[in-house]
């Protein structure tokens, strides 16, 4: 075997490998003989078919099988011999096979970059200092009351923001109805901003059974090209107005939650505080991790293999489709939509792997248990959830990876510049929500 490995671009390489004809012909001959021992052909007993007939019938496929095996085997040897760190799937470029002549083929592939972590002491992290106080508990209680609210029809009062309304509407532009502009028994909570600007405000002040028109202009950024910036008229028939009623915080209200019988309001508040503290702890850890990783990447920018980016794009597209009811649309989105995030994730993976390898980090079983318990606490039966995870190898691998990543983050934080920033619970959780929404 003769080998020439050359760099074609950044992390891309090409291996040109020449295989000796004697080795190929011997392997083909051995395979023909082996095939003849078990071959069946009309007019011959099993294993008694002449070699020349075997070659006529199976020779080409045997030759192809041998060449494929040789190409893969000798490329694997090349990778070991040249001490190359292969990334992604290699692309084989077969040569032309001529009997009794040496066979030359090429393989195009990528290698992992050589990561040399630097400037770790320049990593900057802003640590949120968040206190959970009684006002935050009160706000959560109010939120829980709203989740349990009931609706009562009010026939004599005009619609207000916060009301739930049921109505028919017909929209038109220049006197012509447009697609999606007509609906019957449409239910909407006023003030949620689900319609074009001015629509909900146009209903406020009207009473049940009224029929009226509102004139609106579609936003310039509206998704339908034919309606962008167009003035439209909506004929509305208001059929029902409902106002919400919040439950009192009493024994009946407490029964809605998974608490022991005859629990007090104080017990409910304590449970709420515990759950909020758990979510807060997770959110703070997540924020610190995000900042650490962002700073690490900014200080250690490097080229990453395109093949790994392509694999990550596929993974992101599949994940996005699994969470959407518009799977076909997501599958048709251009790959460029996912490219930036995919490249970032690949870089993060490479850098954290280097931190883990350099520091010889191993999984802390206690951390694994903590992660498991945090996940399980969000479910109705935590013990069953933990058992479910422990019996699922894929899920447990994810937990182990999270625990290992956490070990890497802690190593990075030892040398990082950390500044503390006091912030209210509500403001911090708002920031977390906005960040999560932007990343979706």
From Swiss-Prot:
Database matches in SUPFAM superfamilies: FKBP-like, Triger factor/SurA peptide-binding domain-like, Trigger factor ribosome-binding domain
EC number: 5.2.1.8
Gene Ontology BP annotations: 'de novo' cotranslational protein folding; cell division; chaperone-mediated protein folding; protein transport; protein unfolding
PPIase FKBP-type domain: residues covered: 162-247
Catalysis: reaction(s): [protein]-peptidylproline (omega=180) = [protein]-peptidylproline (omega=0)
Protein family according to the UniProt entry: Belongs to the FKBP-type PPIase family. Tig subfamily.
Function (record text): Involved in protein export. Acts as a chaperone by maintaining the newly synthesized protein in an open conformation. Functions as a peptidyl-prolyl cis-trans isomerase.
Protein name: Trigger factor
This protein's encoding gene: tig
């Amino acid at each position: 075997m003769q080998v020439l490995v050359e760099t074609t671009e950044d992390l891309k390489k090409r291996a040109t490998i020449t295989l000796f004809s004697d080795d190929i012909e011997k392997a083909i001959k051995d395979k023909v003989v082996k095939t003849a021992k078990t071959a069946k052909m009309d007019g011959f007993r099993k294993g008694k078919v002449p070699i020349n007939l075997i070659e006529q019938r199976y020779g080409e496929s045997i030759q192809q099988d041998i060449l494929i095996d040789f190409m893969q085997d000798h490329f694997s040897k090349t990778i070991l011999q040249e001490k190359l760190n292969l990334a992604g799937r290699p692309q084989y470029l077969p040569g032309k096979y001529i009997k009794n002549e040496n066979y030359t083929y090429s393989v195009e592939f990528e290698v992992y970059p050589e990561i040399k972590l630097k400037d770790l002491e320049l990593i900057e992290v802003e640590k949120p200092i968040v206190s959970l106080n009684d006002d935050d508990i009160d706000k959560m209680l109010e939120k829980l009351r709203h989740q349990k609210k009931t609706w009562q029809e009010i026939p004599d009062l005009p619609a207000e923001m916060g009301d739930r309304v049921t109505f028919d509407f017909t929209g038109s532009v220049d006197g012509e109805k447009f697609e999606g502009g007509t609906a019957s028994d449409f239910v909407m909570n006023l003030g949620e901003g689900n319609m074009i600007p001015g629509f909900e405000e146009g209903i406020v002040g009207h009473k049940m059974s009224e029929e009226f028109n509102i004139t609106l202009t579609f936003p310039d950024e509206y998704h339908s090209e034919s309606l962008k910036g167009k003035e439209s008229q909506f004929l509305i028939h208001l059929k029902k107005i409902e106002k919400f009623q919040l439950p009192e915080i009493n024994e009946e209200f407490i029964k809605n939650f998974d608490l022991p019988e005859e629990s007090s309001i104080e017990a409910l508040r304590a449970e709420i505080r515990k759950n909020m503290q758990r979510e807060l702890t997770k959110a703070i850890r997540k924020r610190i991790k995000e900042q650490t990783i962002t700073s690490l990447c900014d200080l250690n920018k490097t080229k990453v293999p395109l093949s790994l980016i392509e694999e990550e794009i596929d993974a992101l597209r599949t994940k996005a489709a699994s969470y959407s009811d518009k799977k076909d649309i997501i599958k048709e989105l251009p790959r460029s939509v996912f490219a930036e995030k995919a490249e970032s994730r690949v870089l993060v993976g490479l850098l954290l792997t280097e931190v883990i390898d350099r520091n010889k980090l191993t999984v802390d079983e206690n951390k694994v248990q903590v992660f498991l318990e945090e996940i399980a606490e969000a479910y109705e039966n935590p013990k069953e959830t933990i058992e479910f995870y422990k019996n699922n190898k894929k899920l447990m691998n994810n937990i182990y990876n999270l625990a290992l990543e956490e070990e890497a983050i802690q190593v990075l934080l030892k040398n990082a510049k950390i500044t503390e920033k006091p912030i209210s619970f509500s403001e911090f959780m708002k920031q977390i929500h906005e960040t999560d929404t932007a990343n979706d």
